[in-house]
Structures are given as C-alpha cells and as structure tokens.
Amino acid sequence: MANTVHLSSSSLFIQTRGRKYNSILSFNNLQKRTVLSLSCALTSQGGKDMIPPKGKSNDRNFAFDFKSYMIRKAESVSMALNVSVPPQDPLAIQEAVRYSLLAGGKRVRPLLCIAACELVGGDEATAMSAACAVEMIHTSSLIHDDLPCMDDADLRRGKPTNHKVFGEHMAVLAGDALLALAFEHMTVVSSGLVAPERMIRSVTELAKAIGTKGLVAGQVSDLCSQGLNPYDVGLERLEFIHLHKTAALLEAAAVLGAIIGGGTEEEIQKLRKYGRCIGLLFQVVDDIIDVTESTEELGKTAGKDVMARKLTYPRLIGLERSREVAEKLRREAAEQLLGFDSNKVAPLVALASYIACRHN
C-alpha cells in the first residue's frame, strides 16, 4: 500500500521514440498503450519522496498518494481528449491534430484545472471540458513552437514533431484548429454544468492568458531576446518572458478550475498566485534540465536553448542560483495553499513538489 509518493520526475516519459503514426488507426492503438505506459512508469520507478511540505494546510497523519491520483486524472483526461477529436473528414487535419493532442505527456495543466475545481467544491466532470481546453491550447502552442520559423525542433515527447510528420502547412493548421476547438469544447460541453457568468469569466481568462497579454507576449519577447547578451537583457526581462510564455497558461488552468468549481473570490486569487508560482517554477526547472539532461531523457532535443542563445535562468544566473530560485518558488506556491482543507489541497501541494523535482 502506498503511504507516500515515490515519483521519479522522469517516470512520466512515454516511450514512443523512433515511431511515426500516420493514421488514425495506428494512433488510436498508441492512445490505448499510453495509459498503460503511464501507469507502468509511475508504479515501477522510484525516486525522491514527495511528501507535501509541513504547514498549516497539511495533516501530519495524512500521506497523499500522488502516483495514483496522477494516473487516474491522466486516464480521464486522455479519454476525454480522444472523444473530443473523433476521426472525421477532412482526415488529413484530424490525423495531425490527434497525433499531437493524444501523444501522452504529463497532462499537468488539465490536472491542475481539475484539482483546483475539486479543491473549491467542484468535481472532475464539471472541470473536464475546461481541462481539455487548456490541454488543447497547450498542444497548439507546442506545435507552433516547434515549427522551423520558431524553435525548429525535431522531437517532442520522444516522437518526431508534428511538422516533421505532416508537413509545415498541416502543422500550422493543426495548431489553429486546436486553438479554435478549445473554446468550442469548453463552452458547448460545459453547457448546463456551469453558470453562464462563470463560463463567460472563464473564457475571458483563457483568452487573456494566450494572447498579447499572455503566451504570445512571452513568445515575442523570447524571440526578440535571442542572441542578446543576457546581462544587457536582465533578470526582469527573463521573468517577463517566463511569466507570460509558460506561467500564464498554468495560472489560467488553476483559475479556470476555481471559477468553474464555484470558488470564492479569495479562493480564486489564492489559486491564481499558486498557478503563477508553479508556472514560473515549471519554466525555471525546464531551463535547468535543458542543460543537465540528455535528448533521450528529455524526449526532445537537449541543449536547443543554448544553441539558439536563448535567455534562460542558468545562462543568466548559473545553475546553483537557478535551483535556489526554483526552491523559493515551490515554497511560495505552497504558501498560497495555507488555509485550505488539508486533504483536498494535497494534490496541489504534491504537484508543486513534482514540478520542482522533475527531470523531463
């Protein structure tokens, strides 16, 4: 029986390297195996104990099984995503969409959305359409980010990137399709489950998180900073990039869950700050592992940020200080959870620790 969480942060890597899935049928088979691979990875690998940090929001007699929780949520999200993009005409675009959307991954953003919803009194069913919408947008951003005109990446989640399989033209359209589908899915599927005023607020939050006040702003700043002397750019600009390019969508995932779950304004704002902290934490750790892990371990090309002379935390302040920043952000995230029910908040406490300790 699992009393504490022993989760190697590399354990969520789904082994699909070296394979191409050019049909709906073959990718459906992959989808079925992904859940099994995720389960095996989480239950077979050891790692650093991830017990929620002690504090007012934690019961010392309660140990949360994060492995089982993450497996359950990943299974639920993957099944919901599979249903959301059925094979239909035109098959060419559907195959490209499904290839990236159903490629596994850690499902951190939908998990965060569901956990936030459950924390404030909602349930998984109510949060699922928003959780799927966030993952669709995240996948859209990855497809576009990997394009030759952006990061020019060959691998994503251990597989050839979307444009390597389907061509640049189809990859652009797949990303566009997912962006539109996210809002359609969230509003149509949630109809009758979420009060209209809360849905309108949720749509506004999500749109803001991915536009010129969020993800796009971060991407533009990142592109404009490439090749510059990091000391001329500075830490403030680096934080702006990461808060917008990465943290904005994670923050939105938490906020959407809290809004849809019926949270109070105080609860929504606490979870907003939590999401922002773990969002920045996610990117700081991503910067660290880009220079400390191999391509095989990452499931994507290692060292690309260095080769592109991108502005990163290790490049600006070094590895040790970057690790200190990561730990500080983990603590700040945990502080936002004080005052919530200790059992209900356990997934979010464990999630912050998982992000801080991950290797891919």
Curated annotation (Swiss-Prot):
Residues annotated for isopentenyl diphosphate binding in this entry: 106, 109, 138, 157
Annotated binding of Mg(2+) 2, by residue: 145, 151
EC id: 2.5.1.-, 2.5.1.1, 2.5.1.29, 2.5.1.10
Organelle transit peptide residues: 1-39
Protein residues bound to Mg(2+) 1: 145, 151
Cofactor(s), names only, from the UniProt record: Mg(2+)
Magnesium as UniProt keyword: yes
Protein keywords: Carotenoid biosynthesis, Chloroplast, Isoprene biosynthesis, Magnesium, Metal-binding, Plastid, Transferase, Transit peptide
GO cellular component terms attached to this protein's record: chloroplast; plastoglobule
GO molecular function annotations of the record: (2E,6E)-farnesyl diphosphate synthase activity; dimethylallyltranstransferase activity; geranylfarnesyl diphosphate synthase activity; geranylgeranyl diphosphate synthase activity; metal ion binding
Cell compartment(s), UniProt: Plastid, Chloroplast
Role, per record: Catalyzes the trans-addition of the three molecules of IPP onto DMAPP to form geranylgeranyl pyrophosphate.
Similarity comment: Belongs to the FPP/GGPP synthase family.
Subunit comment: Monomer.
Protein name stated in the entry: Geranylgeranyl pyrophosphate synthase 12, chloroplastic
Native organism: Arabidopsis thaliana (Mouse-ear cress)
